[in-house]
Amino acid sequence: MKTSIFAAGFCVLASVATAETPVLTVYTYDSFVSDWGPGPAVEKAFEATCGCDLQFVGAGDGAALLARIRLEGARTKADVVLGLDTNLTATAAETGLFAPSGIRANYDLPVAWEDTTFVPYDWGYFAFVYDKTKLATPPKGFKALAASDLKIVIQDPRSSTPGLGLLLWVKDAYGDEAPMIWEDLSDNIVTVTKGWSEAYGMFLEGEADMVLSYTTSPAYHLIAEQDDTKAAAPFAEGHYMQIEVAAKLAGTGQPELADKFLQFMVSDGFQSIIPTTNWMYPAITPADGLPDGFETLITPAKSLLVPAGQADALRDAALAEWLTALSK
């Protein structure tokens, strides 16, 4: 009997302790919460300071995050969304589901940052990655790629931020000629995946000659695997920039904790994790600088970026052109 009473009392105390620990729910993309992504290290570092339970929820790829939040609306369990980018922020703001954070920081971004709702945490350039042992002379642009017999894997712009980035990359570089570029590229495309992880996995398994990824992707192979055979192909048209962001939900039940997390994201404790887990440039250079190996990455001679306020309208037109070209 005493054992039963003791056990019951212990369970009550455990329940009270659990109830007193605030939970912060963060929706993000799948690769962020993978064992090799930033999620585990970020969770450990933040929980050491917040007295809370940080729970990441993988919700597909970046563009799928916004779709899920819009579907859930005010009923969403998310306190913070991490993994949108500037191609989606205007659309996200129009939903009315996100609240200003007021976070300010001295960012090391290639562009000025004035948005007080969305907090940037990393950035990079899209690129086609290839294996130098299999492809000695990579194409130097979209037209050269389309004229080749190389096979590529790309991501769906409706669910993936890299896929959307490619869409706007082609549109920004070629304007009215974009439909022709897509028609010419259609024979090169092996498949269109829902997200980045699937596409990159296919490339590593030898199912394509090149994959849409980032100029920083070869750093993973160089630093984590001591493999210098992967490289990003410089394109004459320039490379499209991605700035990834996070924001708190207006309906969060943990507004102060959400703000604390966003503030943590611009601290060295978070930013120092990004280069060798998310394999992107951090929004703020860590105190110890970038890891050795990042200096070997290509630097685009020209960078492209559609302003957030214009990406909305341009995206719809570019998506229609893309769908038409790939359906032929």
Residue ranges and their predicted role:
Residues 111, 124, 182-186, 192-193, ...:
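Periplasmic-binding protein-like
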Residues 98-105, 116-120, 143, 222-240, ...:
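Short beta-strand->loop
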Residues 291-328:
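Extracellular/periplasmic bilobal clamshell ligand-binding domains
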Residues 127-134, 171, 242-255, 273-276:
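A bilobed periplasmic-binding-protein/Venus flytrap-type ligand-binding module shared by bacterial periplasmic
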Residues 23, 27-39, 60-64, 76-208:
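Extracytoplasmic ligand-binding site segments that recognize negatively charged/polar headgroups
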Residues 249-305:
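Mature extracytoplasmic/periplasmic domains
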Residues 87-91, 204, 208-229, 278:
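A ligand-binding cleft/hinge motif common to bilobed small-molecule-binding domains
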Residues 40-56:
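Short alpha-helix C-terminal cap/hinge motif
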